[in-house]
């Protein structure tokens, strides 16, 4: 994702769903001085660590962290890139919820679409809830292939599998 952002200079405003400890937001903001990132995290402990990490990196003027459920986060801002890295089973709902914050050319970036290889090989897991989750991820991948609002490229061999969906 970082290389994608680096090579697309038009990406300036980013929304990240799933801050965790702020690593991705910090890395994105460090790529170029002209980017701003809004990042949303529901877990208070993760959020607090992220805020500390963002401040330690000196990026608090360009990385804005919000502690709330992503479905409660409302903004009229239009983003160049929307990075969804939260609850994998909710990817489609997040995409629909934040589609109003997109325009033609906005990039939706989805991570972890292989889920450690289990999506394509469910026999790798004996855990029922993991198998159910990977079925939902597979269903989302299949849906994304047919969603005519996007031009989508899958790179399942990159990291843990990614999709880059550009709004038509």
Give a label for each model feature.
Residues 1-168:
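S-adenosylmethionine/decaboxylated-SAM
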